[in-house]
Design a protein with these regions (language model features):
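Helix-to-loop junction immediately C-terminal to a conserved catalytic motif
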Residues: 57
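Catalytic Walker B motif of ABC-type/P-loop ATPase nucleotide-binding domains
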Residues: 168-171
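Conserved ABC ATPase signature
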Residues: 143-147
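Conserved ABC transporter NBD signature motif
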Residues: 65-73, 82
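Conserved structural motif at the start of ABC-family nucleotide-binding domains
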Residues: 7, 26-28
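The feature captures the beta-strand-to-loop junction immediately N-terminal to the Walker
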Residues: 42-44
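Conserved ABC ATPase "signature" region
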Residues: 106, 121-139, 164
Length: 219
């Protein structure tokens, strides 16, 4: 059976709208992201990687073209619907150093429980499974400020996992990491894509690991 894309773009144009008009970064882009696949986006700084990721996560609108998420135009999704469909992990280091690992990951359940939502047994099970999946369960009660950069990245991936989204987008997830941690994170993401049947898209400068561990490369 042919796999159905989680998100598809047809003749997509990305860029910015300013008071001087439109500034196109890339145009005529057509592609799909599929469940069970890790796709790596490669390119130099300023090549438009972050612009594409922001467009796909609905953080900024496209300039033209069609963008479909699970067969529905992306712009028709409410913020709550998007948060249940697209998980986003940014490069910026988390400022939630006063939270434990468990507490931070639990915030990823907000799309299902609401901002002040109470966690039910099912939520706690999902959180535990995510911590186990990324190999950070033993740090559940540690404060995030005490973690290494690689451990913090695992926590943010776990936070995205508990959103139960079919699509996860990561902006430079291996930035600031040493070689061993970069390999570990890339291996983990490929494993999660396959085992949890998720479409995962990441931007990276790590060409060697992307070549080895990605199912698809976008240049």
């Amino acid at each position: 059976m042919e796999k159905q894309a989680v998100i598809t773009a047809t003749d997509l144009c990305i860029g910015y709208r300013t008071h001087k008009g439109e500034k196109k970064v890339h145009e005529h882009l057509s592609f799909g992201l599929y469940p069970g696949e890790l796709t790596s986006l490669l390119g130099a700084n300023g090549a438009g990687k972050s612009t594409l990721l922001r467009t796909l996560s609905a953080s900024q609108p496209s300039l033209a073209g069609d963008l479909q998420l699970l067969g529905k135009p992306l712009q028709q999704y409410s913020e709550k619907e998007r948060s249940r469909t697209i998980g986003v992990v940014l490069t910026d280091k988390t400022q939630a150093g006063g939270l434990t690992v468990y507490e931070l990951v639990a915030l990823g359940r907000q799309p299902h429980t609401g901002f002040f939502g109470r966690l039910h047994p099912k939520d706690h099970l999902i959180i535990k499974e995510a911590l186990d999946a990324v190999g950070i369960a033993h740090k559940a009660e540690s404060y995030t400020a005490e973690l290494s950069d690689g451990e913090r990245q695992k926590v943010m991936i776990a936070k995205a996992l508990v959103q139960e989204c079919p699509l996860i987008i990561l902006d430079e997830p291996t930035a600031f990491l040493d070689v061993v941690s970069r390999i570990e994170i890339m291996t983990l993401l490929h494993q999660l894509a396959v085992e949890q049947n998720k479409a995962i898209l990441l931007s990276t400068h790590d060409i060697e690991q992307a070549l080895v561990l990605s199912d698809k490369l976008w240049l």
